[in-house]
Amino acid sequence: MATVNTDATDKDISKFKVTFTLVVSGIECITGILGSGFITAIYGAEWARGKTLPTGDRIMLMLSFSRLLLQIWMMLENIFSLLFRIVYNQNSVYILFKVITVFLNHSNLWFAAWLKVFYCLRIANFNHPLFFLMKRKIIVLMPWLLRLSVLVSLSFSFPLSRDVFNVYVNSSIPIPSSNSTEKKYFSETNMVNLVFFYNMGIFVPLIMFILAATLLILSLKRHTLHMGSNATGSRDPSMKAHIGAIKATSYFLILYIFNAIALFLSTSNIFDTYSSWNILCKIIMAAYPAGHSVQLILGNPGLRRAWKRFQHQVPLYLKGQTL
């Protein structure tokens, strides 16, 4: 059985690393919570009023709500792992954090992949029978695909609660050349089971996202070149919109892949718990959902208008409270 063993002491992490990790990841998580919470509130209010949400808005509602839960959970995990290490390294607590983190991340990766597939089918233009078939069927199938994604995420996340992680704390490790002792945190990770369940849960949405993003970029680039050949000019608003969409899609394709890699490295304990590499993984994992939520607001005219109204109303509300 292939296992990865790590150990750490309280001396292995400096106050600077603790502060840096909490501040940077905290800013990212709070940004993501505000962005995801705003999108959830806008679409959730429409759904609560009995309105039928369009397919794209429905995907964004589920994606934003799951991200809201994810980033709250990530903040809690960072606080416990850095400030309450004895509690965090109890086996049941540690496994709970890991399993729910993987489940929420898998769900987010699925929802993000379906959103990219939906936009690709709606915007891109390819003369292929399969593409036309998917374009016609996607609206009917999407509610079932979203439900199936949650079930798949559950199926490949909760088995991680058995025979994958084992952590414990030894509070009586003798310090050489001293009569005192120190706490040492040990972790064991069954890499065979982790790699199997993690890859099974992430492989399909990762391939879907890469294919959909690549097809969307190719279609937009082809259309942009066509517009350029017709001498519409690089300053044309439509041309700028296409170039902006290509850049945004390329950026989040790269960040999506990095997020998937960072999640695996962080979960597998390949790096020491308090190493700079593990801290970098935590920062990347918090950056992707936060950045994508902000981009969704800025790139959606309806959400952008709602955000401007919100910004205008908050000062008025606060002013009324002080009177």
Swiss-Prot record:
InterPro entries: TAS2R. Pfam families: TAS2R (PF05296). It comes from the Eukaryota. Residues 1-14, 80-100, 163-190, 269-276 are extracellular. Glycans are attached at N170, N179. CDD domains: 7tm_TAS2R40 (cd15014). GO terms for cellular component: membrane; plasma membrane. Residues 36-58, 122-140, 212-247, 298-323 are cytoplasmic. One of its GO terms (biological process) is detection of chemical stimulus involved in sensory perception of bitter taste. Keywords: G-protein coupled receptor, Glycoprotein, Membrane, Receptor, Sensory transduction, Taste, Transducer, Transmembrane, Transmembrane helix. GO terms for molecular function: bitter taste receptor activity; G protein-coupled receptor activity. Expressed in subsets of taste receptor cells of the tongue and exclusively in gustducin-positive cells. The chain crosses the membrane at residues 15-35, 59-79, 101-121, 141-162, 191-211, 248-268, 277-297. PANTHER family: TASTE RECEPTOR TYPE 2 (PTHR11394), TASTE RECEPTOR TYPE 2 MEMBER 40 (PTHR11394:SF47). Several bitter taste receptors are expressed in a single taste receptor cell. Gustducin-coupled receptor implicated in the perception of bitter compounds in the oral cavity and the gastrointestinal tract. Signals through PLCB2 and the calcium-regulated cation channel TRPM5. Belongs to the G-protein coupled receptor T2R family. This is Taste receptor type 2 member 40. It comes from Homo sapiens (Human). The lineage of its organism: Eukaryota, Metazoa, Chordata, Craniata, Vertebrata. The gene is TAS2R40.
